[in-house]
Amino acid sequence: VKILIVEFITGGGLAAEKAPESLAREGDMMLQALLAELNALKGLECAVMLDWRYQNNISEQTLTKIIVQENENFYQVLARTLPDYDVFWPIAPETDHALAEMVRLSAEIGVKCAASCLSAIDLCSDKLATMNVLKSVLPVPETRNLTVFTPEFPSAWVVKPIDGAGCEQTILVSDRQSYRQCLAEIDRPEAFIAQRYVAGKAISLSVLFKAGQAWLLCCNEQQIKIDDNHFVLMGCRVNSAIDHLASYHNVIDAIARSIPGLWGYVGIDLIEIPDRTHTGKHQLRVLEINPRLTTSYAGIQAATGINVAEQVLQLFDGEPDMTRLRNETVTLKL
C-alpha cells in the first residue's frame, strides 16, 4: 500500500511565506511521530511532501520525499502527486480551510483519505457552528461572533479565530483596556469569536471515531500559560488525566452521535472545573473539536503502547484494537 503523508506547515503549504514557528514545531512533532508509527508496519510504502526549508527534517532513507519549492503552488504539487498513491494522510490546521481543501482534493482525485468527511471538517472548522451544534447535548461556554459581541465585564472572555489552530491569536479579555488592545490586533473581526472564559484545568481527549462510534485513546493535560493576555501552549502531559473516565466517554459518545462524519483521530479540547455543589465532583465544558492529529498524538504510543496510525488504518476495514501495552504519562514540551 502506497501512502502519502502531508503535514501542511512543513509540507509546503506556506512555501512562499514565513511559517509560524510554533505551528511548524507542532507540525514537525506530529509528522515525525506518524512516520515512526507507519515505518513500524509491514506492507506500506511511505512518501512525504516537504517544504524546501524543511527537507532535511526527515532522515529516513526508505521514504520518498517530494519537495515543494518556494515558487511552487502547494495544491498543484499535491494534485499531481496524489494519483500515484493508494492512501492520503493529511495533517493540517483548519485555518483558511487548509484541511478541508486537502481532503476535497483527494476526494476529487479518488484517493482514499485518512480523515473525517468534508461536512464534519467544515463544521469543526467553524468554532461557532460547532458550539451551536453541541450546545443541545453537551455543556459549552457561551460563544458569539466578535461582530455581535458586546463585552460584559467583570466576566472574562477569550477571543480567538473562528478557524484557528493551537493558541494562535488566542487572547484573554478581562476589562475595557484589554478589549481595546485585542481589537487593535485583529484585522477581520468577523473571522473571530468571543467565548466566555472558564477557569479550570485545560484537558484534551485523543479519540478515534467512525460512523457515529467513538473510542477513547487517552486524556491529556494541556500546559498553557497566559503571557500579556495571550494564551501560549507550552506542552502537554499525555495520558495523565484519568479521574473522570465515565464523563469523558459520555462526551465522546455525544459528539459521535452529533457529528457522525468524524472519522479517524480527533482531538477534543475541554475545561474541567470543580463542581462547587458536590465535593469531589467536576463539570466539563467542551471548547472545540479538532478533526485531525493533535500535538498530544506524538506521545500516545510511548504512553500506552498503542500504534495509533495502525489503528486508524484499521478503521478502513473494521474497528480498532485499543489494547494497551503500558499505562504511563509522557510529557511533551513545545
Describe the residue ranges of each PLM region.
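Extreme N-terminal starter segment of soluble prokaryotic enzymes
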Residues: 1-4
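Short N-terminal binding/cap micro-motifs at the start of the first secondary-structure element
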Residues: 11-17
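Short catalytic helix/loop segments, enriched in acidic residues and glycine
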Residues: 18-38
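Conserved N-proximal alpha/beta basic substrate-recognition cap immediately N-terminal to
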Residues: 48-144
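Peripheral (often C-terminal) accessory segments that flank ATP-dependent C-N-forming ligase machineries
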Residues: 87, 277-280, 310-334
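Active-site nucleotide/adenylate-binding loops and adjacent lid/helix of ATP-dependent enzymes
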Residues: 118-202, 209-214, 235-249
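ATP-dependent carboxylate/phosphate-activation module, predominantly the ATP-grasp catalytic core
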Residues: 196-261, 272, 276, 290-316, ...
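Conserved protein kinase catalytic/activation segment
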Residues: 281-285
